[in-house]
Amino acid sequence: MAFTLLFGAGVSGDVATASAVGMIGSFLAAAALIVVPAASFLLWVSQKDALERGR
């Protein structure tokens, strides 16, 4: 049913491609703004803790 609604509505491939590119761009932006800084912070804390325990 959804297949018929999607292609019966006249949605072009260009619109679907633009939407997919936008979604991928959003994922990359989220990774750059949220995941990378959080991972960097956690690695920094982990390394700092390991150095303090080694003393």
Curated annotation (Swiss-Prot):
Transmembrane segments: 24-44
Keyword Magnesium listed: no
GO biological process, one term: photosynthesis
Subcellular location: Cellular thylakoid membrane
The organism's place on the tree of life at top rank: Bacteria
Keyword Transmembrane: yes
Residues spanning the signal sequence: none
Subunit comment: PSII consists of a core antenna complex that captures photons, and an electron transfer chain that converts photonic excitation into a charge separation. PSII forms dimeric complexes.
Family assignment from sequence similarity: Belongs to the PsbX family. Type 2 subfamily.
Protein name (database record): Photosystem II reaction center X protein
Gene name of this polypeptide: psbX
